[in-house]
Amino acid sequence: MNSIQMLVGLANPGPEYANTRHNAGAWFIEQLAARYNCTLKHDPKYHGLTGKVIIQDQEFKLLIPTTYMNLSGKAVGSLANFFKIPVESILVAHDELDLEPGVAKLKKGGGHGGHNGLKDIIAKMANQKDFMRLRIGVGHPGHREMVTGWVLGKAAKADQEKMDAAIDEAVRCMEILAKDGVLKAQNRLHSFKP
């Protein structure tokens, strides 16, 4: 029923970026790892923090690239190639400007929408775009020129609480994804209200 084998959370490395909106994807992987008692370990071979969890008797590889965001494909490609994981069996969690805080959506395929992490993954995966995305809403600052400062900035407390709630729900939905597939997980996640 489920074909996902690898879960990736995009981020920039280092303490100065840890709590910035751009690291929302990594927050998802950290929460998932904590829920399933997995300790993420740095693995230079895969250019990231790696681990594995068993959900509903299925193994999922976890990855948070420790490259900068615009080099995320290096880490994703390394792990996927080593374990022979096809692109459509990868789920990438990332911050999404076009969704409000408190909203998270699962989507298959698509473009990069200007997201440098997605852009690099697509480039390193021979232009294949069919991986799943977990889009975690961080809201939009209103003007294009303000986007960089926005994603590299920290959210207000109320927005952070909404994002945390959406991520928590997304983590719970991985159980549904493993048991009943993407569509059921999508239905549950897309009806969530923080």
UniProtKB/Swiss-Prot annotation:
GO terms for biological process: protein quality control for misfolded or incompletely synthesized proteins; rescue of stalled ribosome. The keyword Cytoplasm applies. It is found in: Cytoplasm. The record marks 95 as: Stabilizes the basic form of H active site to accept a proton. It catalyses: an N-acyl-L-alpha-aminoacyl-tRNA + H2O = an N-acyl-L-amino acid + a tRNA + H(+). PROSITE patterns: PEPT_TRNA_HYDROL_1 (PS01195), PEPT_TRNA_HYDROL_2 (PS01196). The record marks 12 as: Discriminates between blocked and unblocked aminoacyl-tRNA. The active site is at 22 (proton acceptor). InterPro entries: Pept_tRNA_hydro (IPR001328), Pept_tRNA_hydro_CS (IPR018171), Pept_tRNA_hydro_sf (IPR036416). The keyword Nucleotide-binding does not apply. One of its GO terms (molecular function) is tRNA binding. Keywords: Cytoplasm, Hydrolase, RNA-binding, tRNA-binding. Monomer. Belongs to the PTH family. Hydrolyzes ribosome-free peptidyl-tRNAs (with 1 or more amino acids incorporated), which drop off the ribosome during protein synthesis, or as a result of ribosome stalling. This is Peptidyl-tRNA hydrolase. It comes from Pseudoalteromonas translucida (strain TAC 125).
